[in-house]
């Protein structure tokens, strides 16, 4: 170690330790990565290294220890790669230039139209020799001697700022801590495109320290003109032009305050750019705050990225971020970046600039920029992703968009349920609902077909792995499905928010979509359900056969509505939703609330008896109808919740009317009766924790309804087909019961999601696979043919686990046992 010479080189304001190996300064690649190029993606750096054919030197133990001694590498590092100073410079220049170029190239065409790139840019783009070897070296620190630029020396003079008319202009090179380095001013007006385009390749020109030269080139447009141009081109007048200079980086400007004080606003001094600018190249921070620099550098990302990006943290931040923005939102960002990323760029740029402002240090800036870039990307990508998920159908649903917006409005109108959900934008819940919710939402576009199909598919695929029985389950769990789809989808996100609210919103959205959608599809169903008011009506047998028990389910739905009626907010929303579902669905069909009545979900016994045999097919169809109905119901709920809270009462009245046919719980049972889950649980599923359950439902399928009973006080009810009276009993207490259950469920769901997921003893003694039949003989406890019992198979029944399309691999306990295997 004694013979190893080490030292420190400051590059672009970053202090790098080096070892002298074979007469060469060798820098730790890890430090170059983390400190010097920290705001540049590693992959980019590696690509540049490969492109530049950087030669790596692997440290031996002694060198490693020495590097640790000078804190160039982590003390726990087991190995280190060194690269020569030349390679560091080349890599730094390349990475910075490339980053700029990437973004700028796209803008170059536009920028070219504006101006030819200033020589400074050409120099920046020029081979690093021009940059590095020239007086203006980006590599400030590496060649400690390289720093002295006549300009930089001048820029250090307090009066220099006064001398520099363009002090307010962005400086390519921002001052390094403790000293001013020549900053090449990028004319605010100049689009980074200029830099990029053009003449970078053939026109590489070393920067002339002569300020006049730079100013003429860079500031060919006076800041005022530049400001106008900026405003015009980049919308950056605020951030790019002197004003930002005042706004954003007073922190930074404190260095420049004397300069700025001396420097008139660019608009005021058109001659500034013409004045000799010793600092043109070297304005340390003269008037460019990091913000400005970032704005400028953002546009002059080259310069900024070259030297100023690191030197002026804002520059690097905004330039890189905006570069990436530019890459991502090149055209938008050009304008927006020009405006400091007027919009997104503006946010991030502002944040970054602010952070940069706060931390003049380039490293702080760099981190900010990295994070900001990522955040920006995230934010940029996010809307697309959101839209991609939800809006892809949303566009399809744009026709139904009116409905969907209405749903959104409805969602907005849901004050009580949406209070917490309200904050979320419709798009948000579209996202939250994921595809399922998005599907209902988008289904309006497809309306009848899209929504049911997607939803059925989703429900089968998403809600329940078991597509066949799943459809039965789904059908029986329509409420849950609606919830699972509407709420379940949203549930993952909505779980924290009131899923019920989200669901209601979704439901409303879906409802709006669905009334059209399902009513379109289910108009017959609605009619049939209307016929199903008689619940037995087979006039709708076409769809009744499809949904033989839909009348029951319809009745259940009204009953369910009655249940929500008990729960004032939930009931109002649910009943209103149900009523609205009735109204909407019925409106779609016969515009009669009986639609929901007709939507009556198949009774457990029917479900149990028929669902598993012929009903499997019918069940799926029924389930689809019911699902549509349930979703209608949910959407109706949501919509009702919006507009029909009174209607909810109306719905209550209707549900009460319907309740006789099936109590709210009966309805919920109707919906989930096949699953044997009581309505309160359904309500909870819909309005409360059950929505969370819907998350599981989404994962597991509709099972949560079945599993609801174990968790719920309604367990017995859920397990056994709930008589109407029984349901009514809950209906009477449903408000309290649902609220209680919901609360319990929310609490227990939260807890159950955490602790109840696996209740060994609760799940262990699975129901016997063989039982003694009425004839005294052994009978399979479970079969697809358990029509003997009016009740659906026990929740532990394999049918719930091993349905067609279901996973043969048991679900994780958190999903498997939560209200499922009880």
UniProtKB/Swiss-Prot annotation:
Claim: Ubl conjugation is one of the keywords in the record: yes
Keywords per UniProt: Isopeptide bond, Ubl conjugation
Region Disordered, residue ranges: 245-370, 658-677, 706-732
InterPro entries reported for this sequence: DNA-bd_dom_put_sf (IPR009061), ElonginBC-PRC2_ViralRestrict (IPR052119), EPOP (IPR027971), SKI/SNO/DAC (IPR003380), Ski_DNA-bd_sf (IPR037000)
Polar residues bias (residue ranges): 660-675
Crosslink (Glycyl lysine isopeptide (Lys-Gly) (interchain with G-Cter in SUMO2)) position: 602
Basic residues bias spans: 245-261
Low complexity bias spans: 278-318
Acidic residues composition bias: residue spans: 319-338
Family named by the database record: Belongs to the DACH/dachshund family.
Protein name: SKI/DACH domain-containing protein 1
Organism of provenance: Mus musculus (Mouse)
Higher taxonomy: Eukaryota, Metazoa, Chordata, Craniata, Vertebrata
């Amino acid at each position: 170690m004694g013979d190893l010479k080490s030292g420190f080189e400051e590059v672009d304001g970053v202090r790098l330790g080096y070892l002298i190996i074979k007469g060469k300064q060798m820098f730790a690649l890890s430090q170059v990565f983390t400190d010097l190029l920290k705001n540049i993606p590693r992959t980019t750096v590696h690509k540049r290294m490969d492109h530049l054919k950087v030669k790596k030197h692997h440290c031996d133990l002694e060198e490693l220890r020495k590097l640790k001694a000078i804190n160039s590498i982590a003390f726990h590092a087991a190995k280190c790669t060194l690269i020569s100073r030349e390679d560091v410079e080349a890599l730094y220049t390349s990475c910075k230039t490339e980053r700029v170029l990437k973004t700028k190239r796209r803008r170059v065409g536009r920028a070219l139209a504006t101006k030819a790139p200033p020589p400074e840019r050409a120099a920046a783009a020029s081979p690093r020799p021009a940059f590095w070897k020239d007086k203006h070296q980006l590599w400030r620190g590496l060649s400690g001697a390289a720093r002295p630029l006549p300009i930089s020396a001048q820029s250090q003079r307090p009066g220099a700022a006064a001398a520099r008319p363009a002090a307010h202009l962005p400086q390519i090179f921002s001052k390094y801590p403790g000293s001013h380095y020549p900053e090449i001013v990028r004319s605010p007006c100049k689009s980074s495109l200029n830099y990029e385009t053009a003449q970078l390749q053939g026109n590489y020109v070393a920067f002339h320290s002569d300020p006049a030269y730079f100013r003429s080139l860079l500031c060919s447009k006076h800041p005022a003109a530049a400001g106008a141009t900026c405003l015009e081109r980049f919308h950056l007048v605020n951030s790019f032009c002197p004003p930002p200079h005042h706004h954003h980086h007073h922190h930074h400007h404190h260095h420049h305050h004397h300069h700025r004080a001396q420097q008139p606003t660019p608009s005021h001094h058109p001659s500034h750019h013409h004045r000799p600018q010793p600092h043109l190249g070297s304005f340390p921070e003269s008037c460019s705050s990091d913000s400005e620099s970032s704005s400028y550098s953002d546009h002059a990302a080259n310069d900024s990225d070259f030297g100023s990006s690191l030197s002026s943290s804002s520059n690097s931040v905004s330039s890189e971020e905006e570069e990436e923005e530019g890459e991502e939102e090149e055209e938008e960002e050009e304008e927006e970046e020009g405006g400091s990323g007027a919009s997104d760029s503006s946010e991030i740029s502002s944040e970054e600039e602010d952070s940069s402002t706060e931390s003049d240090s380039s490293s702080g800036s760099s981190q900010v920029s990295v994070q900001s870039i990522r955040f920006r990307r995230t934010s940029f990508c996010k809307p697309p992703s959101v839209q991609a998920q939800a809006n892809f159908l949303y566009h399809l649903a744009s026709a139904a968009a009116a409905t969907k917006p209405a749903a959104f409005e409805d969602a907005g109108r849901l004050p009580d349920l949406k209070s917490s959900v309200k904050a979320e934008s419709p798009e948000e819940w579209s996202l939250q609902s994921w595809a399922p919710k998005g599907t209902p939402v988008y289904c309006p576009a497809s309306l009848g077909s899209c929504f049911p199909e997607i939803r059925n598919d989703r429900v089968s695929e998403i809600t329940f792995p078991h597509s066949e029985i799943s459809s039965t389950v789904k059908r029986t769990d329509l409420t849950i499905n609606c919830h699972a789809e509407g709420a379940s989808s949203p549930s993952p996100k909505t779980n924290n928010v009131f899923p019920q609210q989200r669901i209601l919103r979704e439901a409303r959205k879906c409802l709006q979509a669905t009334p059209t959608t399902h009513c379109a599809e289910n108009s017959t169903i609605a009619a049939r359900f209307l016929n199903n008011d008689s619940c037995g009506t087979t006039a709708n047998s076409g769809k009744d056969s499809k949904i033989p028990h839909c009348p029951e389910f319809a009745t259940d739905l009204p009953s369910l509505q009655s249940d929500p009626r008990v729960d004032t907010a939930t009931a109002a929303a649910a009943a209103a939703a149900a009523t609205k579902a009735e109204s909407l669905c019925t409106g779609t069909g016969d515009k009669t609330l009986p639609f929901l009545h007709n939507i009556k979900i198949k009774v457990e016994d029917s479900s149990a008896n028929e669902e598993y045999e012929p009903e499997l097919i019918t069940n799926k169809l029924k389930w689809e109808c019911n699902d549509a109905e349930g979703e209608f119901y949910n959407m109706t709920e949501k919509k009702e919740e919006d507009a029909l809270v009174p209607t909810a009462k109306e719905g209550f009245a209707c549900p009460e009317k319907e309740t006789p046919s099936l109590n709210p719980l009966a309805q919920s049972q109707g919906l989930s009766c096949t699953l044997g889950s009581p309505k309160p649980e359904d309500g909870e599923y819909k309005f409360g924790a059950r929505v969370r359950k819907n998350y599981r439902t989404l994962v597991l399928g509709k099972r949560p309804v079945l599993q609801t009973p174990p968790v719920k006080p309604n367990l017995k009810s859920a397990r056994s087909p709930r008589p109407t009276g029984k349901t009514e009993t809950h209906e009477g207490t449903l408000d309290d019961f649902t609220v209680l259950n919901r609360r319990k469920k929310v609490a227990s769901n939260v807890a159950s999601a955490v602790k109840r997921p696996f209740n060994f003893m609760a799940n262990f003694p699975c129901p016997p696979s063989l039982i003694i039949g009425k004839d005294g003989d052994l009978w399979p406890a479970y079969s697809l043919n358990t029509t003997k019992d009016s009740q659906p198979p026990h929740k532990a029944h394999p049918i719930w686990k091993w349905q067609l399309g279901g996973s043969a691999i048991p679900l994780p306990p958190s999903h498997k046992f939560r209200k499922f295997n009880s």
